[in-house]
Structures are given as structure tokens and as C-alpha cells.
Amino acid sequence: MARTTPIERYRNFGIMAHIDAGKTTTSERILFYTGVSHKIGEVHDGAAVMDWMEQEQERGITITSAATTAFWSGMDKSMPQHRFNIIDTPGHVDFTIEVERSLRVLDGAVFVLCAVGGVQPQSETVWRQANKYSVPRMAFVNKMDRTGANFDKVVEQLKARLGAYAVPMQVPIGAEDGFEGVVDLLKMKAIHWDTASQGTTFEYRDIPADLVDVATEARSFMVEAAAEASEDLMDKYLNEGDLSEQEILSGLRERTLKVEIVPVFCGSAFKNKGVQAMLDGVVHLLPSPADRPPVQGIDEDEKEDTRAATDTAPFSALAFKIMTDPFVGSLTFFRVYSGTLNSGDQVYNPVKSKKERVGRILQMHSNNREEIKEVRAGDIAAAVGLKDVTTGDTLCAQDKIITLERMVFPEPVISMAVEPKTKSDQEKMGMALGRLAQEDPSFRVKTDEESGQTIISGMGELHLDIIVDRMRREFNVEANVGKPQVAYRETIRKSDVKSDYKHAKQSGGKGQYGHVVIELSPMTEEERKSENVKDDFLFINDITGGIIPKEFIPSVEKGLRETITSGPIAGFPVVGVKVKLVFGSYHDVDSSEMAFKLAASMAFKQGFAKASPVLLEPIMKVEIVSPEDYLGDVMGDVSRRRGVLQGQDDSPSGKIINAMIPLGEMFGYATSLRSMSQGRATFSMEFDHYEEAPANIADAVTKKG
């Protein structure tokens, strides 16, 4: 089957935003204008097409990135048809993993901002993630119809807070109740969308007299930004004082693709104004898969390799999301970087070293699906029937193996015990949690060896709430959950602490004998970055002259590594410790791997106790947006929670307070902040670092442990 849309006319982009910037409504309008959705789904009614998990519709926040394919021929239907693969991403900090996952497979992004709230704390987190993957992006200032909407202020914030070279492509006509449309700075015409047709038709008019000067100045800024793309354009601009529409677009496109500028559009998705022109911007300014550098990976011999975005290159794809679907079972969403794949083909997963057969291939439109026979470079689709694939795995041709860069997922910071309400649900709960962990690598499940309890860990309270909720809805497992527990860590402060332990049991017959002398020290920052460090622990063998035979050294390391998973203070993992094996002895007959493993373990426990052991607690970077009236209460509360204030910023909705607060003090914070501010303050938090817990906290944790 031949390719229906040339790859140059593909746009794989994500819609990213802070909560409440109107991202889901914007996505809905895109689906409506591209003809996929016949009725506009409003988030207010819990009917949005993109938010297709029940909890998302209830909570009105987007959790899962749903991938949708749509087509666009321009606002005035004059362009050749372009194929959009749109990925909707969540804006809540507990789900940054979802954002990271989608950014990895996108070519570009549309950043939706609220014209009233502007650049919110969370926008900065998402922006940083987009910088990490060098994703070209444009901005859409939404909610221009809301009281307090201010386009210029948001453009300034893009520059000041995000360091973006923001280039407005439009100027709004009016704001708040008086928002009527936009001035297109390329054509220097006013665009008015027809309300009766829900914005599907529009007309160009002359620019209102009071906006001519503003528009002329904004256009000069835009043309100048375009001219800086190349010497030729700059020469023409300096000589003639202007550039043609085509030259402006090609200059802006070139600079957007290099992530040098961020073109800015505006509108009100809710009022059906502006999204249409923004979609034209996606075509003109965001990259096709062919505009992005070839994807990088490593081949079978661990050498660097690349794949170009062509149908003739060997097949390579990245599985970026696993979902459990009530009708077809497990769905693997994947992005094809190169080559083609037909349903029924075999693919190779180099991460798991396994071959898999691709059963059916589905083209997803939110949660409706259409079966297709093949996918080609640039496509995003979902495969049915892949058994052993985890988020972040590569799928490739068996004869041309490549492993694409793995995604890095953060360690969970919060845990809670969970048990089924009825014994008969135990097995069902195990299966449900297994499925959910396969979908979401930032969610972990383990069994506590001592208590036999099932412990679930994740990125925040909301994250775990939603997991428990999904167990109930999707797997019919009712569960009781324990109180959230903090993921503490243990380490030492003293250097070069010697510990000598001899494990000797000789009671007739073959005995056991292992003797080790080790030195414990905290790792330096440089050492922690070294590639020999695994699980934040460094083992150095300093034995010479066969004092301990070579074959027993791995057992010593194994004994140490098994011990650090549960530290001596309160059973939390040990981090940042370097252990040097400096001396020991052995017995020709009685020494064994087991004896050395035990000796190493005991030497470590004794040495750790002498090396000024300390408990570390996770510190969260918290950003609170509060109206000024409640500032005193909010800041007093931050101090009571052992928070350290990092500074304040102004925000349209009051003040932004930045603070570092221990996670242990943040449980239930959402509820107490709501009552403190009568529901008007909001906050977001993400893990920042570990630091030593004060003695009273360490004592309380140790007693509990």
C-alpha cells in the first residue's frame, strides 16, 4: 500500500499546558475543526473526547496522553491536506512522567497558556522538559475572553520567566467581554470568526483604526525575527524594509525548528476563536518528522547508530505508552521513526532480547479506533497483542537491530500499603497492580518481606489515589490503603571508617570461613556521577596478592549490595556510600561464597553504625500561588511545615511562593491549603533532593521502623 500523505506534510505535536489553561478544550476544538468530532465535547460537562478515562472526566484534569490522528487543509481550505498526530499531555505535576513520555516521541509542541494566569509554576516544569528534548514549540494564549485577560503580559512572562524569544504572530482585537478576533500580522488583516457556524467560517476585515499602530509595531518585530534567520533575508530586509509573506514564514520556521524563537498565537478555544489560525501556524511553523535530526540509538555492538525518517530505512519505533483496554486487552502506543510495519509482522525488542508478532495495528482517535494494515515512518499508532513490552522499549527490524535512547524515569517518593477488602480479591489485585505498573514506570509495586503487605509507590498522593481508583473501576478490586509513607534514605557522614568481621563456624565436617576488612566513606559528588556507581553505591576492590582469592570478591560485593537495600537505621535503602575492600583472609577448605557474603554484610552493618549514620528525607520544591489576602497564613504554614522560603514572584492571581518543604510535612496539604485560602490558592510540587533529617524526625522514624 502506497503512502497517502507525504512525510513532509506530517505534524506530530503535543498540546502542553498548566492545569486550567484550557488545554483539553483547545484539543477538543482541534478535533472539531479538523472534522474528527461532530459535536464539541465540553470539559464542563465531563464529555471531552481526549479525556477518556472516567476519573479524568470526573476530575476535569487530563491524566493519560491520548494520541489522535486528524487532517487539516488550512483555515481557508487552500493548503494540501496535512496529517496531524496529536498527543494530549497532562499538566499535573504528579504526571510529569506522562509529559516526559510524550515529549520523547513528539516533533513539536503547542504550549497553551491562560491569558489571565499567564506562566504558572507548572508551565516552567513542562517547559524545562521540552528544552531537555529540544522540542520546537509555539504558544497559544487562550481564554482571551476571560476577565483579566492580558496578551502582552503573558508574552512578557514568556520572555522573563521561561527565557523564550517570544514572537507574536497576531495581536488580539479587544479582550475580556470585548474580545472579537485577532489581527493576522502576516496579512495585516483582522480575522473575525463566525459565531453561528461555531467558528468554522471567517472573514478578513480591515484592522480597527485604534490597533493600526500596535499591529505595525508588532509586525516589524516579527519581520525582524524572521530576517535574523539568514544573511540573505537580513540583507533584503535592510535594503527594502520588508519581506514577503513567504519569506517571513520560511525565516520564522527555520528559527522555530532550531528552538531559537517561540511564535505566539492567541484566542479563546471556548468561544471558538483563534484555534483555527493556530492550526495554520502548526503547518507553517512546526516540523515534520523529516525536519528533525535522524533518531539516535546504539547497534548490537554498542556503537552509535541513526535511523533517517524514510520508508526505505530499516524499521525502528519506540513504545511510549502501554494501556489496558477493556475490549482488546493490552495496547502498545508506538511512534515509528523509520521504515514500515505491516500487521502480522515480527518485530524485535532489543531491550528484552525478544521477538514479538504484531497482531492488529490500530489508528487511535482518542478512545475510538480504526484498524489499519500498515504504518510508516512518522506514524503514531497502537499495536494489539505485544506481550512483553514496557514503556520506553524499542521495537525494530530483526536484521537491523538498534536500541533507541531509553527514557529515564524518576524514583518514586511516596509509598503506601494496600490490601484488598476481601481475601478473594488478592489474586485479582496482584494482576491489576502488575498491569498498572507495566503502563506506568513511575509507579512501583513490591511486597514487604516482614509484614507481607503489598506496598505501592509513586510520584505523589494524587498519583496513588488515581491508581487505587483505577483498580476499583477497571479491575473491580476494592482496596483499603494505609497512610502514605515517605521514602527516606540512609547514609553516613564519617570517612575512612574501618570495619573488620570474621565469619567462622567450625563444628566438625566442612565449616564456614570468611574474613573481610572494609573501609566506609561517603561518596563525593564527582564519584556519584562515575559510571562505576550502581544504585548510588560504589564498591572498590583494593585487595592485592591473593589475600582473598579472586573468585570470592564478587560474593563480597553481592553481600554488600544485598545489605544496602535495607539500611541499619530504619530499614531504608542506603545511598551515597563508598566501600573499599582492603584486607581479609580465607581458609583453603572452609571458605565459600556464602561465608564471604555473610562476612561482608556483617562488616558493613558494624561499620555503618560507627560512621555517623544519618537519615535523609526527600525535600520537595513547592510552588504556591495565593491571593495576597491569605499570604500571611500560607507563609506561616510553610514555616510550620519546616519549609525554607526561596523567594516570591508576582502572579495575576496574587503571589507565587517558592519553598523547599520536606515531603513528610506535605501530606494532606491540598486540603489544608484549600481551607486556609477558601479554595483560591493552588500549589504544585516536585521532588528536588534528599537532605539530612533533623534528630527528632530521625528518632520518630527509627522508633516506628
From Swiss-Prot:
Organism: Xanthomonas euvesicatoria pv. vesicatoria (strain 85-10)
Name this protein carries in UniProt: Elongation factor G
Compartment(s) where it occurs, according to its Swiss-Prot or TrEMBL record: Cytoplasm
Any one Gene Ontology BP term: ribosome disassembly
GO MF entries: GTP binding; GTPase activity; guanosine tetraphosphate binding; translation elongation factor activity
Keywords (A to Z) from UniProt: Cytoplasm, Elongation factor, GTP-binding, Nucleotide-binding, Protein biosynthesis
NCBIfam families in UniProt: EF-G (TIGR00484), PRK12740.1-5 (NF009381), small_GTP (TIGR00231)
Recorded family membership: Belongs to the TRAFAC class translation factor GTPase superfamily. Classic translation factor GTPase family. EF-G/EF-2 subfamily.
Record-listed GTP binding positions: 17-24, 88-92, 142-145
PANTHER family the UniProt entry points to: RIBOSOME-RELEASING FACTOR 2, MITOCHONDRIAL (PTHR43261:SF1), TRANSLATION ELONGATION FACTOR G-RELATED (PTHR43261)
Domain tr-type G: 8-290
Entry-linked SUPFAM superfamilies: EF-G C-terminal domain-like (SSF54980), P-loop containing nucleoside triphosphate hydrolases (SSF52540), Ribosomal protein S5 domain 2-like (SSF54211), Translation proteins (SSF50447)
InterPro entries: EFG_II (IPR041095), EFG_III (IPR009022), EFG_III/V (IPR035647), EFG_IV (IPR047872), EFG_V (IPR035649), EFG_V-like (IPR000640), EFTu-like_2 (IPR004161), G_TR_CS (IPR031157)
Region (Disordered): 290-309
Domain of life: Bacteria
GO cellular component term, pick one: cytoplasm
Functional description taken from the UniProt entry: Catalyzes the GTP-dependent ribosomal translocation step during translation elongation. During this step, the ribosome changes from the pre-translocational (PRE) to the post-translocational (POST) state as the newly formed A-site-bound peptidyl-tRNA and P-site-bound deacylated tRNA move to the P and E sites, respectively. Catalyzes the coordinated movement of the two tRNA molecules, the mRNA and conformational changes in the ribosome.
Main location as per UniProt: cytoplasm
